[in-house]
């Protein structure tokens, strides 16, 4: 039996869900698995283990079984509570945090025995591998950004040189064109002077002057 009740704190990004189960003669084992799905890290905080009102006057022993895929086959179950109705009907568990999956077993006694606690989910906690993957992705993004910035800087440094190189031939062409125009203007002026009637008249007068006799 799971008691579902959720609460969250924004500061720590933690969600807690009430949890409980019953061990008895009919069901001697119970495996805890997270109720919420996702990449949140989950812990089971075990609070109390107590006998039911119908429990017999006998010793009830509750233990945690080792994981089924445990490599070390020599690992033994761990007893967490020994209860008896007239002596110790309930125990409080302080600071007990378990990682799922966790299997509880009623080793001795007929029950019922009730276990209660909280499921604690921390959305901000990541596994070591996930943290490494995220750090690797961030480093790759930073390297790509640095490469882009270097490429932009190199383009900015090269572009003024290219502009200067382009301006030099343009300047030389304008100087050559100017000289050509000046030369053409001089030729035009010379041809105009040669064709002037005043200059021709002076030339003929000078040619006839030596021909007069006294």
From Swiss-Prot:
It holds the Pfam family Nucleoplasmin. Residues 181-197 have a biased composition (Basic and acidic residues). Residues 127-155 have a biased composition (Acidic residues). The record marks 57, 84 as: Interaction between pentamers. Keywords: Chaperone, Chromatin regulator, Developmental protein, Fertilization, Nucleus. Residues 119-214 are annotated as: Disordered. A motif (Bipartite nuclear localization signal) lies at residues 165-180. GO terms for biological process: blastocyst development; chromatin remodeling; oocyte differentiation; positive regulation of DNA replication; positive regulation of meiotic nuclear division; regulation of exit from mitosis; single fertilization. Its main location: nucleus. It is found in: Nucleus. The keyword Manganese does not apply. One of its GO terms (molecular function) is RNA binding. One of its GO terms (cellular component) is cytoplasm. SUPFAM superfamilies: Nucleoplasmin-like core domain (SSF69203). Residues 129-152 are annotated as: Acidic tract A2. Residues 198-214 have a biased composition (Basic residues). Gene3D superfamilies: Nucleoplasmin core domain. Homopentamer, when bound to H2A-H2B dimers only. Homodecamer of two stacked pentamers, when bound to H2A-H2B dimers and H3-H4 tetramers simultaneously. The acidic tract A2 mediates histone binding. PANTHER family: NUCLEOPLASMIN, NUCLEOPLASMIN-2. Belongs to the nucleoplasmin family. Core histones chaperone involved in chromatin reprogramming, specially during fertilization and early embryonic development. Probably involved in sperm DNA decondensation during fertilization. This is Nucleoplasmin-2. It comes from Homo sapiens (Human).
